[in-house]
Amino acid sequence: MIHAGNAITVQMLADGIAEFRFDLQGESVNKFNRATIEDFKAAIAAVKANNDIKGLVVTSGKSTFIVGADITEFGQNFAQGEKAIVDWLMPVHEIFNSFEDLDLPKVAAINGMALGGGFEMCLVCDYRVMSEAAQVGLPEIKLGIYPGFGGSVRLSRLIGIDNAVEWMAMATPKKPAAALKDGAVDAVVAADKLLDAATDLVKQAISGRLNWKAKRQEKLEAVKLNPLEQMMAFNTAKGAVLAKANPAQYPAPKLLLDSLQAGASLARDEALKAEAEGFAKAAVTPQAEALIGLFINDQVVKKASKQHEKGAHPVNQAAVLGAGIMGGGIAYQAASKGTPIIMKDIGNPQLALGMKEANNLLTKQVERKKMKPVQMGETLARIRPTLSYEEFKEVDIVIEAVTENPKVKEIVLAETEKNVRENTIIASNTSTISITRLAKALQRPENFVGMHFFNPVHMMPLVEVIRGEKTSEEAIATTVVLAQKMGKTPIVVNDCPGFLVNRVLFPYFGAFDLLVKDGADFQQIDNVMSKFGWPMGPAYLIDVVGIDTGVHGAEVMAEGFPDRMKPDYKGAIEAMYEAKRLGQKNDVGFYKYELDKKGKKAKTVDPTAYEVIAPFVTGEKREFDNQEIIDRMMLALCNETVRCLEDNIVATASEADMAMIMGIGFPPFRGGPCRYIDQTGVAEYVALCDKYAHLGKAYEAPQMLRDMAANNKKFYG
């Protein structure tokens, strides 16, 4: 054994070839944490000291290659400021450079995921051989940063600026064929041939049949483009990237382009310094803090879900009650992920509608070449439409998705319970109705749970799993595991009106209503909140949700929380409802909707909307300060999120933030309501609440925040 460290071993194979093997002890994956980087340095020194080594094959002892840097170390590193980040990165560059500069050929044998720092490790090798099962990529942009271990410098020299920018800005892992086509890897082989293929490449390089030094030299020099070609390449790249990423919201892509441009005409070492300086600028942004926090929160949510696996009973057969758009979407989602599902309704027209929805979604998958026609047929065969309960004795879980009316749901649920086994789980896809209330219609309330899908089901990643007063842990666990199997992210919440997401959303709509009442133009509110980072403003959002749905939900919330969700005035949303302007569903709401060239509903300004709401505007019509609009909208939403934590509706700030991002489109680069409060400053946020407390209870700071401010505490760190 030439080197035996905690993360890396080096041992001779044959013919002067050594295996440089990453296998981080005590971890399920390889990652570049501090310990691995130190071991990397020691392993390189051991290779340099051994004159018998003529070439290296770089391998992994895990099912993945290397998944990247240790993201949990970022917070501490990035909190030190730009200079400290550069001072941290430059020694890492020296270590990677010393491996690249070894006077012997090096081939990476990529057996699985090689992402971020993992692929940057592959780039310091002279050749890269990839298994057919592997994927490679530099996805750091998703974290609000960009590759910092030399990836931007080496990849742009290897595959050209245009391709490198696309790889890094899109942040999507590449499959073998795409990686080979772009020139990022040199060969793709079957998994069982990987080590042999990599070893053979090393032998060819040692024998001189391959000029590995010339291959390496390309990465050590400036980009091979003259100044005019460089200017054209970067102008094209900037146009494409900045059209998709607003630098005010996502600064990392522009900082990446700036550092690439600064380093393009420089040799490796100077270009790496430019990369480090640009990386440091990105790393200290609030967006990087929020997006890295989001990644860590995602891990927290997945870990919480995984804990339910042992308590779940298997779901070999599911059923959905109600074959509308929602029922059809649920059936499609289950079937497309391999779970057979019965779809029941009371009439053939309804069943036809549900099957049509599933068929349409599958057809789109085939058209986009994400599914083969034969797979579409197999998926449709897993959905069995029926008018009876005959087959329900074989069902492990039933998802009720009938109309959002408590009396209708109670009748359907009670009828269903009589037609299933005693241990069958019954889940209600309700968005606002109390699970504890609905459970009163059942003989076995312990088997009853809420399973709230968001519309459209195939696109929205979140599922709220709602625990009623008598819901068993087995019912929760089984529902969580099914949601995961369906490709969704489940978050378990306790029962209350609106559960978590809608309970938080309705005060946001309430804040909008109050702003309009006080004289704000709803278009200004929409523009301000869109620029703030929401996918759409609140007026447009309520049109998309459906104004009738919004009014019904508001009534449920007002009954549950009369002190802060029951206004003493009629607002613009209710005015639209009374005028039979329901939003997109009947083409008039706050906006008017007409089909565009692609057949999608596009909004246009409708003067009639202003006439409808005019009698309900009591304040003087004026242009509000943009920050006042942001503060009033965000305080109402964030305060209710904190109250959900106070009331133990949701267990952690991590889960609350993830739910708001996945469920209602909270701007990801702001990290969620709790992260937003942290970044505002808890004491400063409480002061804002006090400033607007005269507007009503929704604006009063929750006691949790006052306590946190008094003790200088934050949600994160």
Swiss-Prot record:
Site feature Important for catalytic activity, where: E120, E140
PROSITE patterns cross-referenced by the UniProt entry: 3HCDH, ENOYL_COA_HYDRATASE
Catalytic activity of the protein: a (3S)-3-hydroxyacyl-CoA + NAD(+) = a 3-oxoacyl-CoA + NADH + H(+); a (3S)-3-hydroxyacyl-CoA = a (2E)-enoyl-CoA + H2O; a 4-saturated-(3S)-3-hydroxyacyl-CoA = a (3E)-enoyl-CoA + H2O; (3S)-3-hydroxybutanoyl-CoA = (3R)-3-hydroxybutanoyl-CoA
Positions with a binding annotation for substrate: D298, N502
Region (3-hydroxyacyl-CoA dehydrogenase): 313-717
UniProt pathway annotation: Lipid metabolism; fatty acid beta-oxidation
GO molecular function per UniProt: 3-hydroxybutyryl-CoA epimerase activity; delta(3)-delta(2)-enoyl-CoA isomerase activity; enoyl-CoA hydratase activity; long-chain-3-hydroxyacyl-CoA dehydrogenase activity; NAD+ binding
Binding site for NAD(+): M326, D345, V402, T403, E404, K409, S431, N455
Biological process terms in GO annotation: fatty acid beta-oxidation
Listed CDD domains: crotonase-like (cd06558)
Active site residues per record: H452 (for 3-hydroxyacyl-coa dehydrogenase activity)
Tagged with keyword NADP: no
InterPro entries assigned: 3-OHacyl-CoA_DH_CS, 3-OHacyl-CoA_DH_NAD-bd, 3HC_DH_C, 6-PGluconate_DH-like_C_sf, ClpP/crotonase-like_dom_sf, Enoyl-CoA_hyd/isom_CS, Enoyl-CoA_hydra/iso, FA_oxidation_alpha_subunit
Enzyme Commission number(s) from the entry: 4.2.1.17, 5.1.2.3, 5.3.3.8, 1.1.1.35
GO cellular component: fatty acid beta-oxidation multienzyme complex
Presence of the UniProt keyword Cytoplasm in the record: no
Keywords in alphabetical order: Fatty acid metabolism, Isomerase, Lipid degradation, Lipid metabolism, Lyase, Multifunctional enzyme, NAD, Oxidoreductase
Region (Enoyl-CoA hydratase/isomerase): 1-190
Gene3D superfamilies tied to this protein: 1.10.1040.50, 2-enoyl-CoA Hydratase, Chain A, domain 1, NAD(P)-binding Rossmann-like Domain
Family: In the N-terminal section; belongs to the enoyl-CoA hydratase/isomerase family. In the C-terminal section; belongs to the 3-hydroxyacyl-CoA dehydrogenase family.
Subunit-structure text: Heterotetramer of two alpha chains (FadB) and two beta chains (FadA).
Job description of the protein: Involved in the aerobic and anaerobic degradation of long-chain fatty acids via beta-oxidation cycle. Catalyzes the formation of 3-oxoacyl-CoA from enoyl-CoA via L-3-hydroxyacyl-CoA. It can also use D-3-hydroxyacyl-CoA and cis-3-enoyl-CoA as substrate.
Protein name: Fatty acid oxidation complex subunit alpha
